[in-house]
Amino acid sequence: MVKGIWVSTSHIPDLGVAAFVGDGEGLRELHIGSSVTSAVDLIGPENLDVADKVSETARVVSGYSVRDIIGAWRSGEDLSDLALRPIGTPFQQMVWSGLRTIPRGQTLSYQAFASTIGRPSAVRAVASACANNRLGLLIPCHRVVRSDGSLGGFRWGLERKRQLLAWERAS
């Protein structure tokens, strides 16, 4: 077992259960499900297979307890100093970095977003990077929608995507 990788779960009112995966350098994954089992089932095997046991132990990342991260996100607090360690290709990393620049409460189409990162012909690759984002909320792929304004897809379901966008617009 690789030391230092941990999984922690926390109930989030009105949203479900969040499963966080981290290590000594930051968060690797964040998933939301309707139960502990459904949230943990979304964790990538490369992390879950080597993690210490799943627990509700409060973990701290960049000074935030995992229970406080969602509260900070909901209140609109700037979380740019939160150490994130997403695992992906260089292109995915570029997309995920760009997603963090979309202002809270706003959306962009996949086409418009691809243009903002200087890759206007990479719309499908952008959509694929969004689909492979394992740090939803903190890397806000929910802010990217189809050109016609419809929601498109979302790892945690379209109802959650709709709910997240509504919360952001209201705050």
Question: Over which residues does each language-model region extend?
Answer:
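Basic nucleic-acid-binding alpha-helical/helix-turn surface characteristic of O6-alkylguanine DNA
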Residues: M1-P120, S171
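LysM (lysin motif) carbohydrate-binding repeats in extracellular/periplasmic proteins that recognize
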Residues: P120-V123, L164
